[in-house]
């Protein structure tokens, strides 16, 4: 597993710095035979939420171009969108995990809270590089977000 820092201080969007990209490449070159799960906070592809996609990873094409040299990086995991996703991205699997707090409603133009319960994603990393995963959510109404909030 490699955890990349996509935070840009003081702004909501993400970007992988030159340092992070070089560090990732050094790590991947050191163990080319190992499967690697790549984790980062910001989503590298459009989520379908106009308001949220302006806060995505700003240099996803740079990341994708670098990863072509490393076929054993077959799964990426991100957060930030507070939604559950399991999609293909440049020939790899991209997972997004729900938030353990407030969920954002999918496919919205403006900020919208979803009434889906907080959740988390369980991962089982298999020796052949596959990732088995399941999303779990709180089963009761212990957590109810303020549906009228204009930001979280």
Model-derived features: positions:
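Binuclear metal-dependent hydrolase catalytic cores centered on His/Asp/Glu-rich metal-binding motifs
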Residues: 1-36, 52-65, 113
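Active-site-proximal beta-strand elements of phosphoester/diester hydrolases
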Residues: 1-8, 37-39, 92-98, 134-136
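Short, catalytically relevant binding-site loops at active-site mouths
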Residues: 9-10, 42-46, 82-84
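A short acidic, helix-capping loop that chelates divalent metal ions and anchors anionic groups
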Residues: 10-12, 46-50, 105
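A short, polar/proline- and glycine-enriched secondary-structure boundary/capping micro-motif
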Residues: 13-15, 106, 142-148
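Short acidic, glycine-rich surface-loop motifs adjacent to enzyme active sites
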Residues: 31-47
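Conserved beta-sheet core of the metallophosphoesterase superfamily
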Residues: 52-122
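A short C-terminal boundary segment appended to hydrolase-like catalytic domains
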Residues: 121-152
